[in-house]
């Protein structure tokens, strides 16, 4: 979202800037993990550009990159916002193109369902094999924007659909695409978080893709994805859609490790104090590692 402001020659608002997203946007060519390890750890120390008395410590984790053949079968539910606020060119039209890109990557043993919401929610595509691309593409192409947003009803139906077609040891995931304008029904962030926290115990992850501008609730979408054991990305053009759904498809859709916690211990003879830069909303306490 901050990238959109910068591309438009605008200073992003403070709450749109999350340092970890800036850092993680780029590819650092970290070495792949060896053996059975799911990730490798890379560290780097450099001078601090804004204070010559300080140092910056960069700690990078590289997850194992899976080939298509190594990826487990996917049970995907596309949960798509087709409310009136999604009518802009960079919302529903871009959303369709993005999910058509993803559809091209699907395999025969993958399954896709499509749930939409706008005033009321509905299942517009029952579970369909990933190699039946024409049917999935047609369902996406028929979508039109209109109505108010009843996001909670859509989320509930999406979880019901994902649970009914659950693949044991597979990738069971809801992909919510929206501008975040939940304005009807259960709309407070705390209520949505409680619902998603309850549902994540079913083994279904929730990933969120943000589209558009103006009323897009950036921080809210990140919080919901965090509580849904999923990830979050912002798509503002077709090139970004290719990055998320083609170049980084494995990282977007597949989980290689759960409940990963990182604890850093500094040598007090060399480090007097430190400050965490980025991921401030994920900071853990010592007792969280017990």
Locate each region found by the language model.
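Exposed acidic/Ser/Thr-rich ligand/metal-binding surfaces
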Residues: 41-263, 268
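Short, solvent-exposed coil/turn linker segments
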Residues: 11, 18, 129-130, 168, ...
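Acidic/polar low-complexity segments with low predicted structural confidence
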Residues: 1-51, 55
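Solvent-exposed beta-strand/loop surfaces of large extracellular or lumenal domains
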Residues: 236, 272-290
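Hydrophobic transmembrane signal anchors and adjacent membrane-proximal interface regions, especially
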Residues: 19, 24, 63, 157, ...
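Short hinge/gating elements
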Residues: 5-11, 207, 287-290
């Amino acid at each position: 979202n901050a990238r959109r402001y910068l591309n438009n020659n605008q200073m992003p608002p403070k709450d749109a800037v999350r340092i970890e997203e800036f850092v993680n946007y780029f590819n650092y060519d970290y070495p792949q993990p060896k053996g059975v390890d799911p990730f490798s750890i890379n560290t780097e120390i450099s001078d601090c550009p804004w204070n010559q008395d300080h140092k910056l410590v960069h700690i990078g984790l590289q997850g194992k990159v899976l080939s298509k053949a190594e990826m487990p079968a996917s049970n995907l539910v596309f949960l798509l916002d087709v409310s009136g606020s999604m009518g802009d060119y960079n919302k529903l039209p871009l959303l369709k193109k993005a999910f058509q890109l993803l559809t091209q990557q699907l395999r025969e043993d993958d399954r896709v369902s499509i749930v939409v919401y706008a005033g009321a929610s509905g299942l517009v595509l029952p579970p369909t094999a990933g190699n039946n691309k024409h049917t999935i593409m047609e369902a996406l192409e028929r979508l039109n924007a209109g109505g108010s947003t009843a996001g909670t009803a859509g989320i509930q139906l999406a979880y019901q659909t994902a649970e009914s077609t659950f693949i044991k040891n597979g990738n069971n995931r809801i992909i919510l695409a929206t501008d975040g304008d939940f304005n009807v029904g259960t709309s407070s962030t705390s209520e949505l978080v409680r619902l998603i926290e309850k549902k994540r115990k079913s083994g279904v992850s929730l990933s969120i893709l943000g589209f558009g501008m103006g009323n897009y609730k950036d921080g809210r979408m990140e919080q919901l994805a965090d509580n849904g054991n999923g990830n979050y990305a912002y798509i503002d053009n077709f090139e970004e859609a290719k990055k998320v759904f083609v170049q980084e498809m494995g990282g977007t859709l597949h989980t290689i490790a759960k409940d990963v916690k990182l604890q850093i211990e500094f040598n007090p003879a060399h480090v007097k104090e430190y400050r965490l830069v980025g991921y401030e909303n994920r900071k853990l306490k010592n007792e969280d590692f017990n």
